[in-house]
Amino acid sequence: MAVSRKDWSALSSLARQRTLEDEEEQERERRRRHRNLSSTTDDEAPRLSQNGDRQASASERLPSVEEAEVPKPLPPASKDEDEDIQSILRTRQERRQRRQVVEAAQAPIQERLEAEEGRNSLSPVQATQKPLVSKKELEIPPRRRLSREQRGPWALEEESLVGREPEERKKGVPEKSPVLEKSSMPKKTAPEKSLVSDKTSISEKVLASEKTSLSEKIAVSEKRNSSEKKSVLEKTSVSEKSLAPGMALGSGRRLVSEKASIFEKALASEKSPTADAKPAPKRATASEQPLAQEPPASGGSPATTKEQRGRALPGKNLPSLAKQGASDPPTVASRLPPVTLQVKIPSKEEEADMSSPTQRTYSSSLKRSSPRTISFRMKPKKENSETTLTRSASMKLPDNTVKLGEKLERYHTAIRRSESVKSRGLPCTELFVAPVGVASKRHLFEKELAGQSRAEPASSRKENLRLSGVVTSRLNLWISRTQESGDQDPQEAQKASSATERTQWGQKSDSSLDAEV
């Protein structure tokens, strides 16, 4: 049972630490809100009274925490559980340290912006004193989380820090504010590492109740500040319109009022777009001019300016604020130049229609037509097809077809000649088809005719040399075939036909040479 109680105590301490972290984040947001509100206000007396109340409440609150924590130290948990919880707490502590480093880096920048914005309304001492007091009052409860016995070596450092803080608050020196914040951040992280031993439920409940009371007091003070600022804004709205645009606060409030009127008129103009199409962008350009006249000091932090606008608006009704919040994205679109250009484009087109001399000659139907048809009729030089077609590939097709036709004709003639040679050789084979008995006995009585047939073609060739090449070739073919058909064997006939073909090609070459000479 003891182990289970220790586990439950460890889990409960983790849950409490999570709630404390959430409360710390909420307190940081409240500090930022206080800074933004302090930059816009003109009153100093309520702040001083609120600071006095908070200091008194902090001084009353601190001893009660120590009294609740000191007399009830619990026995420590087992070593394994302590190590597990410490590993979890270390990771969370590293995250806190990172957040605090970021805040420490951003704090002097925000204070500079506040000092620049509040020069007209506040003295720099009070402007820097306000965030200092609020920060350190809100950071006191986590430092007092542990008893002196459990804290050990950090107790002396914390007591010295607490002793220094009220003295520095009384001094209110603005130059030491970033240094104090940076020095208090790392020293705050050291005692939080020993949160494992903080398992007293009574002390945590006291802390939670104190923090709730502190948050309630802060909320009350914020409501007072907002109500006082609303009254100041309503009183000074008339006087600020007459001021020069060099003041950043006056120009920001003027922009809020102008944009509210512009968007209310823009909603009405959307219902009747034909009547109010041109005046709306002119109002948008009028709102652009005070934007350009704003000094760069006001544009240093866009988040703060947006929050100031959001807090300056609650002087009006809540539904109107919701409408303006819904119409915030169109503000960016209305500032852009394309809105004015869309109004000017139709006027330029009408002037061009009136000034162009070519469209005066056309009828009303041609004026209504698209610009492509007008440009096509106005440029007749492009209709000359001779120059364009000579360069195109379509005009070169007839030349290519003629050349191809000649080549095809030559090819067909060569094919015909080869076919004619083959067809002339066919009847010889048909004539020599004979029965086997006749072919075997033919050599007995045809030996004498074979010698005569061999001698006769030579004499006929010599006689035909005098004629033209084509005629001699054909004559030699016919003579040789008629002589060989009745006398020679099929093998001898084939030899004779090959010899005649050779002589034919030789005679053709000789005749071509004679014709050239």
Swiss-Prot record:
Name of encoding gene: LAD1
Phosphoserine: modified positions: 38, 64, 78, 121, 123, 347, 356, 394, 485
Compositionally biased region (Basic and acidic residues): 134-151, 161-174, 219-233
Protein name as catalogued: Ladinin-1
Region listing for Disordered, in residue ranges: 1-401, 481-517
Cellular component aspect of the GO annotation: actin cytoskeleton; basement membrane; extracellular exosome
Organism of this sequence: Homo sapiens (Human)
Comp. bias (Polar residues): 48-58, 120-131, 355-373, 494-517
PANTHER family: LADININ 1, LADININ-1
Source domain of life: Eukaryota
SEK-type repeats, residues: 203-205, 209-211, 215-217, 221-223, 227-229, 239-241, 257-259, 269-271
Gene Ontology terms, MF aspect: cadherin binding; structural molecule activity
Transmembrane segments: none
Record's keyword terms, sorted: Basement membrane, Extracellular matrix, Methylation, Phosphoprotein, Repeat, Secreted
Function: Anchoring filament protein which is a component of the basement membrane zone.
Location in or out of the cell: Secreted, Extracellular space, Extracellular matrix, Basement membrane
